[in-house]
UniProtKB/Swiss-Prot annotation:
Biological role: Golgi membrane protein involved in vesicular trafficking.
Gene that produces this protein: tvp-18
Protein name listed in UniProt: Golgi apparatus membrane protein tvp-18
Species the sequence originates in: Neurospora crassa (strain ATCC 24698 / 74-OR23-1A / CBS 708.71 / DSM 1257 / FGSC 987)
Superkingdom of origin organism: Eukaryota
Primary localisation category: Golgi
Localization annotation: Golgi apparatus membrane
Length: 149
């Protein structure tokens, strides 16, 4: 199934997975961009956002759990984020944490917060509509995702 066919299924978990990849890229890029400031609280939130980007990478591309040497504790944590409900909750928590960075001063970290929110909403819609989680074949395939989980 091609990427166009995956989007045509109207399964919100596919939309969530691709928005998650976009969120990961934004968290990484804007996390690095906001480290170079003189405000310590922004630096802390930038590092947290950078950490979120790596967590999202392992959540959305489960094949990496097999390839990269990680601890069993980290593997178990990532494997718990496997259903649409848990993914929606995880992205919701990450979005709230990133939005908290705007307490001190509004920065470009607002953008990853918005995309993390959209990703959480997509996974929540998939869960509420009763749609099963479907992994994109482009990002490792559904068969690979079930083999790892």
């Amino acid at each position: 199934m091609a990427l166009k066919d995956e989007f045509a299924t109207r399964n919100f978990s596919i939309y969530g997975q691709w928005l998650g990849i976009l969120s990961m890229i934004l968290c990484f890029a804007l996390g690095i961009a906001n480290i170079f400031t003189f405000r310590p609280i922004i630096i802390v939130f930038s590092v947290i956002t950078l950490c979120f980007s790596f967590v999202i990478l392992f959540v959305e591309v489960p094949l990496l759990l097999r390839i990269c040497p990680t601890s069993p504790t980290f593997d178990n944590l990532i494997r718990k984020i496997s259903t649409n409900y848990t993914r929606a909750a995880a992205y919701g928590v990450m979005a709230v944490v990133v939005f908290l960075s705007c307490i001190d001063r509004t920065t470009s970290l607002l953008v990853p917060g918005i995309f993390l929110s959209f990703t959480g909403i997509c996974y929540a819609l998939a869960a509420l509509k009763g749609q099963a989680f479907v992994g994109s074949k482009t990002l490792g395939g559904a068969g690979v995702a079930q083999m790892i989980v």
